[in-house]
Curated annotation (Swiss-Prot):
Residues 392-454 form the TRAM domain. It comes from Agrobacterium fabrum (strain C58 / ATCC 33970) (Agrobacterium tumefaciens (strain C58)). [4Fe-4S] cluster 1 binds at residues 19, 55, 93. Residues 10-130 form the MTTase N-terminal domain. This is tRNA-2-methylthio-N(6)-dimethylallyladenosine synthase. Monomer. CDD domains: Radical_SAM (cd01335).
Length: 455
């Protein structure tokens, strides 16, 4: 048995790639390992266990993981020469998608564990210490959330005043470009009781804002106290009743699951922030059909208008893919026209990346890389202009800002606007966790500047 130095506590370093759900999963893995004697560290050099929580959405993300594993191999060799324990684990969607291939390409890896089996991680590490190389990537019959512990109050409090809370996993939409149904599985909703209990623990520990997470979060379904069917709207109304919870958000949504009840929740609940991430991917009906999005561009625009009618102060965010197989200049111009029509406060855009195992990978009319790059540059310039215009429209206006963390300057705090922007504020008498009414005085490249209203 390889020895450990120092204290009785083992140390784990977790590197998180990709989406907010991976951030949430990393936190829950850390909590599970804490029950097994692990303390999380931000210094990889002092870790006994390194976990890479991976993303498989784009090809470059997966290759980053293999590059990191190459560096970890050398670290492991050095540790073993010193007689010290050092284990390497790959978690997340690359683990789910590639499984045995990871062990083949990176022999230094000890454990490969998919997103549905994180609750088995402590047991997997025990098996590694017995000499096994472990793969846990099957979809578990048991509910992982029932088995993943929530951290103690003191630990939760140390994590800040905002928190993610996963309520739904997986996706049944099978968009032709996307690996999520293959790496996260079909749509599964957490029970109301689990969600409310976790939310109450977070609020009790000082959390003021909770963001509900799901690959397709507005497909969440549950059962109310009288056995009635609940959707995300009913869950939001229930969470809004928790004393001390000041703000709610949710992401990511699919246009087809944006029903009237959910739109009504945006109208009724001031606790629900006026910001909605609603990906569309393309403005071309032909490409939307090829992507299996199951809605048209016009239907998406009409949905946006309906949402804005219910909540006039709402700001929209979205996702776009350029260069999907078969995308013509006309198709791309349809996307540009949609962006001009919707006017996004923020949006994310990417070149299409072929993902093995998806229907899009089998299409032959791939778009040339230089064409993708040119289109992406044009789209991002338009989106950046809209983002700046939205930020500038807030100058001189007042809003409530949740103070989250210290700023770079003395006596400066950084808060979050209702529309998810960072807000820099001189706050001598204020503290983290306060919600303060401010007046926006200026914009920066990626943030706003403000003063306390009335000062």
């Amino acid at each position: 048995m390889i020895a450990r130095e120092g204290s009785n506590s083992r140390k784990v370093f977790i590197k998180t790639y990709g989406c907010q759900m991976n951030v949430y999963d990393s936190v829950r893995m850390s909590d599970a390992l804490a029950k097994d004697g692990y303390v999380q560290t931000e210094d990889m050099g002092e870790a006994d266990l390194v976990l890479l929580n991976t993303c498989h959405i784009r090809e470059k993300a997966a290759e980053k993981v293999y590059s990191a594993l190459g560096r970890l191999r050398d670290m492991k060799k050095s540790r073993e020469e010193q007689g010290r324990e050092f284990m390497i684990g790959v978690a997340g969607c690359v683990a789910q998608a590639e499984g045995e291939e990871i062990l083949r390409r990176a022999p230094a890896v000890d454990v490969v564990i998919g997103p549905q089996t994180y609750h088995r991680l402590p047991d997997a590490l025990k098996r590694v210490r017995r000499g096994e190389r472990v793969i846990e990537t099957e979809y578990a019959v048991e509910d992982k959330f029932e088995h993943l512990p929530v951290a103690e109050k003191a630990t939760l409090r140390s994590r800040g005043v905002t928190a993610f809370l996963t309520v739904q996993e997986g996706c049944d939409k099978f968009c032709t470009f996307c690996v999520v149904p293959y790496t996260r599985g079909s749509e599964v909703s957490r029970p109301v009781r689990q969600i409310v209990d976790e939310a109450m623990k977070l609020v009790d520990a000082g959390v003021r804002e909770i963001t509900l997470l799901g690959q397709n979060v507005n497909a969440w379904q549950g059962e109310g106290p009288k056995g009635e069917k609940w959707g995300l709207a009913e869950l939001l109304y229930r969470l809004a009743e928790i004393p001390g919870l000041a703000r709610l958000r949710y992401t990511t949504s699919h246009p087809r699951d944006m029903d009237d009840r959910l739109i009504g929740a945006h109208r009724d609940l001031r606790i629900l922030m006026p910001y909605l991430h609603l990906p569309v991917q393309s403005g071309s009906d032909r490409i939307l059909k090829a992507m299996n999005r199951r809605h048209t561009g016009e239907e998406y625009i009409q949905l946006i208008e309906k949402i804005r009618s219910a909540r006039p102060d709402i700001a929209m965010s979205g996702d776009f893919i350029v260069g999907f197989p078969g995308e013509t200049d006309r198709d791309f111009e349809d996307t540009m026209a949609m962006v001009e029509t919707v006017k996004y406060a923020q949006a994310f855009s990417f070149k299409y990346s072929t993902r093995p195992g998806t229907p899009g990978a089998d299409l032959t009319d791939q778009v040339a890389e230089d064409v993708k790059a040119e289109r992406l540059e044009r789209l991002q310039a338009l989106l950046l202009r809209q983002q700046k215009e939205f930020a500038e429209s807030l100058v001189g206006k007042t809003m409530d800002v949740l103070l989250e963390k210290p700023g770079r300057m003395p006596e400066q705090l950084i808060g979050r606007s209702p529309w998810l922007q960072s807000v820099n504020l001189d706050a001598k008498t204020l503290k983290i966790g306060d919600i303060v009414n401010v007046r926006i005085t200026a914009t920066g490249p990626n943030s706003l500047f403000a003063e306390v209203a009335g000062s």
